[in-house]
Amino acid sequence: LIYGVASADSTLTDPAWTIEAAMEALDKAIEEDNLPAYHQLRADILFNKGEFQQAFDEYMIVNNSDVASASSYYLAAKAKERVTGFNIGDVIDLLDKAIAKCGTNMNAEAAVYVLERINWRLRLAQYTEAIADYDLYYTLIGGQVLPNFFFLREQAKFRAGDLEGALKDIQAAIQGSPSTPDYYAEEASIYVRQQKYEDALKSIERAIAIAPDFGACYRLRGVCYVRLKKKTEACEAFNKAKELGDPLAGKLIKEHCK
């Protein structure tokens, strides 16, 4: 109660109603009866004070008790990621435990943890594992996703080398949001990797029709024309990309247009 009031009203000056007073009351309670619930609240207070290592230690007391929960493991992960020099693998391990605690009847709560785990897996370039988590997330929320979900999963599939899977996802994103030029540009990039340059050019045209100043698309158009041995068209596209401020166009002009 003391912590709830003190954290909600920063204008309080009564020393009996401060966060410090709440901590003192908790310490006394722990001395009398070392309950995990007290450590949970102590962890919450320390977290909000920015004392993340201490908060993590308190959350782990809860996690090593018989009242450990998905939430307590998740909060431990959130504290751990804020500790200087933390190990991403440790955070993923805590999220694994949070998800496992959700049991077989996983729901929207588990979906939040899975989404968090995806972000960390991507930072470690664990693309195959991230894709599996995207699939799990999709199932957990009953397929109720926005087009951007397919774009993000496509990025992971692209990096994992699953070009057909990536193409299927970006086309699902396009179907959901046909006026987003980035999706067509991404589709073009996949076609370039597949050496389907004519298909890539069609996707680029769709992107440019929506966003005429999309410099990267002109650069990609130039790359397609280089591969198709059409130097004049390639250089025209590279110069347009440079005109629009694309940072890579100048190098391509030097390589192909001199």
Which residue ranges define each predicted feature?
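Structural marker of alpha-solenoid helical repeat scaffolds
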Residues: 31-32, 65, 101-105, 140-142, ...
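Canonical positions in the second alpha-helix
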Residues: 28-29, 61-62, 97-98, 137, ...
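Terminal, low-structured helical/coil segments at or just beyond the last alpha-helical repeat
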Residues: 227, 231-258
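Residue-level recognition of tetratricopeptide repeat
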Residues: 35-36, 69, 105, 110, ...
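Register position in tetratricopeptide repeats
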Residues: 2-5, 48, 82-84, 123, ...
